[in-house]
Design a protein with these regions (language model features):
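Cyclophilin-like peptidyl-prolyl cis-trans isomerases
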Residues: 1-145
Length: 145
């Protein structure tokens, strides 16, 4: 799903964001399966959602995990339960980002190579925080270790 997807938003000392497998610009992406939400609204049945591209994830931001260096977190809109396929990774040189705790769901950690995340967080970006030179995930592997 994430092969050849770009990191479309990069902010130094904050995060690198990617996961928009539809448009590679931050405007797309959705949950891979039904979790009971359509564009952030709870629904009892997937048939009530008019499109699979509107499937979203429930917020699980109070799971005991925090926004520390090298953590992976779910990107979403400012509305509850609107996470989809987009995510962001915190570089290892971040300062205090506790304001994200309880708002965005932390669900993973970079176990090895976080210095590369930090290097990516320092690439040149335009006024919209988009990398001037595309930063692409050529291949992604999920591990449940």
């Amino acid at each position: 799903m994430y092969d050849n997807v770009t990191f479309h938003r990069i902010i130094d000392d904050f995060m690198i964001q990617g996961g928009d497998f539809e448009n590679n610009d931050g405007s797309g992406g959705y949950a891979a399966q039904w979790y009971g939400y359509c564009n952030g609204q709870a629904m009892s049945d997937a048939a009530d959602c008019d499109s699979e591209t509107k499937y979203t994830l429930p917020d699980e931001a109070d799971n005991g995990l925090f926004h520390l260096p090298c953590m992976v977190s779910m990107a979403k809109t400012s509305q509850p339960n609107t996470g989809g396929s987009q995510f962001f990774i915190m570089p290892d040189d971040i300062t205090n980002h506790t304001w994200l705790n309880g708002v965005h769901t932390v669900f993973g950690q970079v176990i090895s190579g976080c210095e590369h995340v930090t290097t990516l967080s320092q690439v040149q970006t335009d006024s919209n925080n988009r990398p001037v030179t595309p930063v692409i995930i050529t291949s992604a592997t999920v591990s449940e270790e």
